[in-house]
Amino acid sequence: MFWRKTDKERLIGLLEWFLSHDWEFRKSDYENLKVLNTLLLRFDIEPVWVNFSIWDCFYLKEVERERLLEAYKKLKDEQ
């Protein structure tokens, strides 16, 4: 039997993906980032701001990473 993931389950999965990412962005990652930001806004969480380098790598400020980690923990606890 198949069932569709809820928005909360999708958001948790995308946060796990994003927080464990290898810092090199591929074309498919841009779509995931877009969906992640859409779901974050749906749950009244500020979207992710990513800084890109000229080599298609990105970095995340520590404050931003901590904020996302707190949001992830809160969502996991509510699940």
Regions found by a protein language model. Name each.
Residues F2-D29:
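N-terminal acidic leader/helix
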Residues M1-E9, R65, E70-Q79:
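Short intrinsically disordered terminal tails
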Residues S20-L69, K73:
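Acidic, low-complexity, intrinsically disordered interaction modules
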